[in-house]
Amino acid sequence: MTRLLASLLFGLGLLSSLPAFAAERTITLAVQNMDCAECPFVVKKSLQAVPGVGRVAVSYKDKTATVTYDDSEADLGALTGATTNAGYPSAPKS
């Protein structure tokens, strides 16, 4: 009985030290300055360079970028920073 209790407590201790599970998130960004046919490719490439980004779809017509990312590796600031650094400021689409 003592061994069982000790094993159970040890197992619970291991579980409590594991990091929280990451979540896959999708966000649509409104992107400024997209005024030529090459712009969506530059925006997409800048977002794909952010660690944790999985999928990126950019719409020239709608001036948006839809990004799926792992929230344990990337966040909104990293995404908007990447597009801004490429010359295309962005913000969450409302």
At which residue positions do the language-model features occur?
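Cleavable N-terminal signal peptides
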Residues: 3, 8-10, 20
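Cleaved targeting-peptide boundary
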Residues: 21-28, 93-94
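N-terminal compositionally biased, intrinsically disordered segments and leader/signal-like regions
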Residues: 3, 29, 84-85
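Secondary-structure boundary/capping motif
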Residues: 22-25, 62, 86
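N-terminal targeting signals for Sec/Tat export/insertion, comprising classic cleavable signal peptides
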Residues: 27-74, 78
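C-terminal structural segments of small proteins and small subunits
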Residues: 72, 76-90
